[in-house]
Regions:
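Membrane-proximal extracellular/periplasmic loop immediately following the first transmembrane helix
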Residues: 1-5, 121
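A short acidic, helix-capping loop that chelates divalent metal ions and anchors anionic groups
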Residues: 6-10, 91-95, 170-172
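Mid-to-C-terminal secondary-structure elements
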Residues: 13, 20, 24-40, 48-153
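Peri-transmembrane interface segments
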Residues: 126, 134-135, 142, 153-185, ...
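Glycine-rich active-site/cofactor-binding loop and its immediate structural neighborhood
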Residues: 192
Length: 193
């Protein structure tokens, strides 16, 4: 996945939003469902096709509707992209929402949206294990592949980080606990005052 911010335009309407450069299997790995159209194909990625799947809120903001948009053209970073799908609403929070995202082939992202000094660079990889017992093995295999592709010797430390959903949940729980203690402290001070 390669992510960035860019302006998406349809006619006179535009929105600054997250652009996600992804592979053709992203929708399967993340369980991203579509209400209309289809996700792009391996051929679209290979050919650096200018195709896009819009989040429903982004589609609504740009066009005033979430349907009948397949085949229309939006501009991302002033390049035309043909709409091939509309994602199903997932909801979000006040800070971010996948419903405002646009998904394009990672190769189109590298070529047209985020020209990079390091070719084929990515921000992060999403890897899905076959089952919960395979997670550690999948992470070890991914680590081996990344170390080899980064040409790291056995004495060199990793130049990347790896996390799994357990790690993310643990961090979220720690933050929640800290906030709970902080709010309890504020409440106690308020009662004293």
């Amino acid at each position: 996945v390669l992510s960035g911010q860019s302006r998406v335009r349809f006619g006179d309407e535009s929105a600054q939003t997250s652009i996600m450069g992804v592979a053709e299997n992203y929708s399967e790995v993340t369980d991203l469902k579509l209400t209309e159209g289809s996700f792009f194909t391996e051929s679209n990625v290979t050919n650096r096709s200018s195709v896009v799947v819009l989040g429903p809120e982004l589609a609504e903001r740009l066009t005033g509707r979430q349907t009948e948009l397949i085949g229309t053209t939006v501009h991302i970073n002033n390049y035309p992209f043909r709409v091939v799908g509309i994602a199903e609403a997932k909801g979000g929070n006040q800070f971010s929402s996948p419903d405002m995202d646009a998904y394009i082939p990672i190769t189109a992202m590298q070529l047209r949206v985020q020209r990079q000094s390091v070719p084929n660079a990515v921000d992060f990889l999403l890897i899905q294990a076959q089952d919960s017992q395979s997670i550690d093995l999948a992470m070890q295999e991914a680590k081996t592949i990344l170390r080899a592709s980064h040409r790291l010797s056995t004495r060199q430390p990793d130049d990347f980080t790896m996390t799994n959903q357990e790690d993310v949940l643990s961090i979220a729980n720690s933050i929640t606990n800290i906030l709970t203690i902080f709010l309890a402290g504020i409440a106690a001070i308020s009662l004293l005052v």
